[in-house]
Regions:
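A short, Lys/Arg-rich alpha-helix, primarily the initiator
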Residues: 2-23
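Short basic helix-loop element that most often maps to the first helix and adjoining turn
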Residues: 17-33, 94
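Short glycine/serine/threonine/alanine-rich loop segments
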Residues: 26, 37, 73-74
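Residues in the helix-turn-helix
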Residues: 30, 41, 60-63
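Recognition helix of helix-turn-helix/homeodomain-like DNA-binding domains
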Residues: 36-56
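DNA major-groove recognition helix of helix-turn-helix/homeodomain DNA-binding modules
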Residues: 56-76
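Helix-turn-helix/homeodomain-like alpha-helical modules used for DNA recognition
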Residues: 73-95
Length: 95
């Protein structure tokens, strides 16, 4: 079972952002419009090495995560010692 978002979760990684966009087949420009950041900013975020984020970048990562989860029903899966990180699309609720 995948972990759900909690305060302890790290920010989503650049690879997770790229993977989610690939799964959804959306461009950096489309995602940028949704989270109100420039395509150039997304290019930098997706190319940045993993590591600590300053408050501004963490806010952008959090906005991307919220948009992907709420708007596109993406689920981010965080490493737990037995599995690595990943993304998947949530199933729609059954009637």
């Amino acid at each position: 079972m995948a972990k759900t978002k909690s305060i302890e979760d790290p920010p989503i990684s650049a690879a997770m952002i790229r993977a989610a966009r690939g799964l959804l087949n959306i461009s950096q420009a489309k995602l940028g419009e949704l989270v109100n950041v420039s395509t150039r900013t997304l290019i930098k975020i997706e190319a940045a090495p993993e590591g600590r984020l300053d408050a501004r970048r963490r806010a952008v990562h959090d906005a991307i995560r919220k948009a992907m989860e709420d708007h596109y029903s993406i689920e981010f899966i965080f490493p737990d010692g037995q599995t690595g990180e990943g993304v998947r699309k949530r199933r729609p609720p059954k009637d």
